[in-house]
Amino acid sequence: MDIREEKIGSSVKVMIIGRLTADCADQFKQYMQEALARGRRFVLDLSEMEYVDSTGLGAMVFVLQRISEAGGELKIASLQAKP
């Protein structure tokens, strides 16, 4: 998994590239907790995410809860339908 970040107006766009699985879920959670120091409004761009397992999905829910607790907002964009 790679993570790229881009500031767009008052939002921070975070792009997940590759696979979000149990192997990297903690890395994703840590990255997003650190990102809270840079903003409160996030767009999670999943256009380049190839796969997410249940642990990765749980990490996204964890991140959503932390952002909400901090008074922020998280939107998910470009979710790809895969057969």
Annotate each PLM feature:
Residues 1-15:
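Short beta-strand/loop segment at the start of cytosolic alpha/beta domains
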Residues 20-83:
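Amphipathic alpha-helical interaction surfaces in cytosolic regulatory modules
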